[in-house]
Every structure is written in C-alpha cells, then in structure tokens.
C-alpha cells in the first residue's frame, strides 16, 4: 500500500505539472518525504491531528478544487489508498466528507469515474473509522443516496444502490461490535474506554439509553420506515425515496439482524409504532404498484416468521 501511494503521488505530480502549481508543489514535497522514509512519513501523518496542517489532506482538498476530472480522480485514489492505513486523523473526517459533497454539488456534471470513486470511499470510511457516527454518518450516507437518486448514469445509480445495501448493513453490524464491547467489560479500566451515551429513546416502558452506534441504527431504521410510509426522514435529509428500494433495504435489515432486535427494545418499538402501521396501510388499499405490494408482503412474512414473539399484537393485526 505505501508503494501504491508513492506511485499515485508521482502520477499526480505529472498531471499537475503545467496547470496546477500549488497541487504539484504539495505533491512533490510529500513524494520526497515518502521516498526518503515511507514508514516515518506514514507515522507523522497519522500523528498529525490538525486537519489544516495535514499535508496529505490539504493536498487532496487542493486537488479537488481544481475541477479537473483527471486530477480529482488521482486525488481520490490517494484518499482511498490512505484510508486502510488510517493516515487521515479522525478529526479530518468532516473535511473529507465535506469535500466529497462539494464534488457532487452538480451531480449531472460530475465525472462518472469520480462518482464511482466517491461511492468506494464512503464504504471504506464506514468500515475503517468507528467514529463515523451521528451527523458524519448521515452526511456520508447522503453521498450515496444523492448518487442513487440523481445520477443519470445507470452504472452509477446501480452501484450506489449496491453500496447503500452494503453500508446500511455495516451500520447495523457496528451495533453488534458496540454490544460486544460492553459484554467484554470486566473492570473499571475497561469501562473507561467504553462508548459514552449520546441520547435516549422514549418507549412506553421507559427511556432506553442509546450509545453512538445504537443511536445511529435507531434513527436510520426510523427514517427507513418513515420513507416507506411516504413521510420525510429526519436523521437523513431526505424527503422521499423510491418505495421499492426502501422496502428492499428494510427487508435486508429484518432478514439479517433479528438477533439485534432481541437485544434492543427500541428497535422492536419502531417495528410496532412505524413498520407495522405502514404495512397495514399498504395492504388495506389497492396497490399503487405491484412491486411495492410484493415487497410489503415479503416484509409481513418476515415479521410473522422472525419477529412474532416480539410483536404479538401487531402480528395478529397483520393476519386479520
């Protein structure tokens, strides 16, 4: 991977030699350090916590401001290669996501390869950085939703849909890791490193404390149910989303995450208060779309088979 970054820096130097001297100088300086001692350069970049003085990050931002598709592609390749090495500090993630959003300010005019690269980077960020939560997570996912909804290129919109399926699963799987970290706490020293609560979910039985990843899943599931019911989301800045697609996302969640619902009553409450009502509504009137009706029926079958013990009354209502 370090060798790959050196090659990408060389390509960026060559591409910016004539038109973009600021980017070229930054790339040349970083390349010289990299060739002299790659391990030391990686260590120094990893230890730099100030985004404004992070050499690689600032070079990438400069390159993305050129509006040259080739230069931007090379910069995003560098960004993608740096993520598994965690060269970028956690404090830089907001800058990274803001930069990607800037590139999509006019999706129809953004280079296709740049759009595809952005989708890959978002997935890599979610897998690598545990603290992509809350607003950062919302903004990261919106990059994918924007390309899914607005890209005019079929390969981009289909890739965005695939990445969204994958990324939603990653968000839910992070809750399992968070739960396991609490299960592993056996002494005060371990408790010090445990995540701090970020909010509560108000349930009829009383409030439930939410930790970062659990809060993300709670808000995301709420949003998916709202969008399936034709209502605007709150965690995600989305007013609408293709109903067949949002039902597909819900089906993926319910198919693979039943054990998570058993441990988290706030998620079961969403099934009761949001999922079952919109399914009852969808099945009680003539279907506007055959694909929506079929997907709604599949969700009902899933609830009957996998969640009947958690939502007994709601299941009875669905069977009437």
Predicted features by range, described:
Residues 1-2, 41-49, 86-94, 107, ...:
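HEAT/armadillo-like alpha-solenoid scaffolds in large eukaryotic assembly and transport factors
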Residues 1-24, 29, 132, 142, ...:
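Eukaryotic intrinsically disordered, low-complexity segments enriched for acidic and Ser/Thr/Pro residues
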Residues 12-44, 56-57, 69-83, 96-100, ...:
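HEAT-repeat alpha-solenoid elements in large eukaryotic scaffold proteins
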Residues 18, 65-67, 106-110, 147-151, ...:
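Short coil turns that connect the paired helices of HEAT/ARM alpha-solenoid repeats
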Residues 59-63, 99-106, 146-148, 227, ...:
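Alpha-solenoid HEAT/Armadillo-like helical repeat scaffolds in large eukaryotic proteins
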Residues 60, 79, 100-101, 141-145, ...:
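Extended amphipathic alpha-helical scaffolding regions
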Residues 87, 143-152, 166-174, 186-193, ...:
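Eukaryote-specific, cytoplasm-facing alpha-helical/coiled-coil scaffolding segments in long proteins
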Residues 98-157, 162-163, 167:
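Extended alpha-helical scaffolding segments
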């Amino acid at each position: 991977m370090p060798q790959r970054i050196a090659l990408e820096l060389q390509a960026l130097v060559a591409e910016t030699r004539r038109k973009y001297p600021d980017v070229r100088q930054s790339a040349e300086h970083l390349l010289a350090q990299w060739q002299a001692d790659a391990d030391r350069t990686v260590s120094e970049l990893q230890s730099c916590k100030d985004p404004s003085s992070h050499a690689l990050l600032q070079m990438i931002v400069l390159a993305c401001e050129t509006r040259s598709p080739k230069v931007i592609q090379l910069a995003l390749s560098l960004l993608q290669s740096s993520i598994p090495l965690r060269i970028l500090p956690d404090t830089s993630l907001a800058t990274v996501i803001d930069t990607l959003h800037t590139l999509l300010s006019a999706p129809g005019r953004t280079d296709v390869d740049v759009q595809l690269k952005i989708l890959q980077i978002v997935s890599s960020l979610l897998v690598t950085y545990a603290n992509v939560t809350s607003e950062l997570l919302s903004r990261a996912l919106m990059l994918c939703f924007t390309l899914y909804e607005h890209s005019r290129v079929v390969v981009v919109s289909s890739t965005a849909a695939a990445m969204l399926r994958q990324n939603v699963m990653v968000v839910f799987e992070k809750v399992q890791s968070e739960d396991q970290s609490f299960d592993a706490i056996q002494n005060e020293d371990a408790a010090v490193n445990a995540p701090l609560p970020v909010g509560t979910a108000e349930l009829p039985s009383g409030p439930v404390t939410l930790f970062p990843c659990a809060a993300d899943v709670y808000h995301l599931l709420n949003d998916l149910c709202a969008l399936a019911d034709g209502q605007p989301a709150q965690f995600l800045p989305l007013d609408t989303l293709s109903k067949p697609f949002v039902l597909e996302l819900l089906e993926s969640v319910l198919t693979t995450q039943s054990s998570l619902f058993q441990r988290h009553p706030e998620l079961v409450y969403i099934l009761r208060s949001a999922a079952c009502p919109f399914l009852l509504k969808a099945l009680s009137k003539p279907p506007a779309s055959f694909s929506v009706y079929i997907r709604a029926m599949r969700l009902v079958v899933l609830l009957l088979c996998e969640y009947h013990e958690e939502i007994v009354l709601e299941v009875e209502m669905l069977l009437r």
